[in-house]
Amino acid sequence: MAKKMMVRVDDRLIHGQVLTQWVSAINAQKIVVIDDEISKDKMRKNILKFAAPDDMKISILSAERAVEVWNKNKFGNFNVFVLFRDVNMIKKCKDLGLVFPDISLGQMSIIDDRKQIYRQLGLNEAEAQTLLDLEKDGLNIYFQMIPTDKKESLEMVKKVFPNVA
């Protein structure tokens, strides 16, 4: 079972800020990326693995495979940093029975129909609804760009999307 675990949404996945600040904040020895699309793409998997230090264990799993691995050994006997590219994969994992009680929201690029919610984090209405639904189901979800920042609640989502509840 993971000794210590942190779960984060950041569409950049494994990058400098994750490696220099977040991974060191929990002294992570393993990064688990959960993403159906990337788990099937050998080139993108290799790019993510090359981005990490040589001594860092990296797993890139589909949601279904993540549930299997979790049920088998809770991602191993390591301090684990779990990364998602978007909120839909968190919901999919929850629907499959893998629930993470605390989720930090980092960068989600402000593109297409996304509106800026918090710093470099954008959501569209469907993503906002998904997050609020997950919160209603008991998950603790918060905005926090770097470990030294204060955790911010999802209240600002309701201000940007007043029709979402």
Kindly label every feature range from the protein language model.
Residues 2-57:
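Long, hydrophobic N-terminal alpha-helical segment
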Residues 3-7, 29-32, 57-59, 78-82, ...:
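Structural motif
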Residues 10-13, 62, 123:
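A general structural motif
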Residues 19-20, 90, 131:
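Generic hydrophobic/aromatic pocket-lining and core-packing "Φ" positions
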Residues 25, 49, 53, 58-61, ...:
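NTP/phosphate- and nucleic-acid-binding module
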Residues 39-41, 66-67, 110-113:
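Short gly/pro/ser/thr-enriched loop/turn and capping motifs at secondary-structure boundaries
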Residues 59-106:
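Ordered, amphipathic secondary-structure segments that act as subunit-interaction surfaces
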Residues 96, 101-165:
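Glycine-rich, aromatic-bearing surface loops/beta-hairpins
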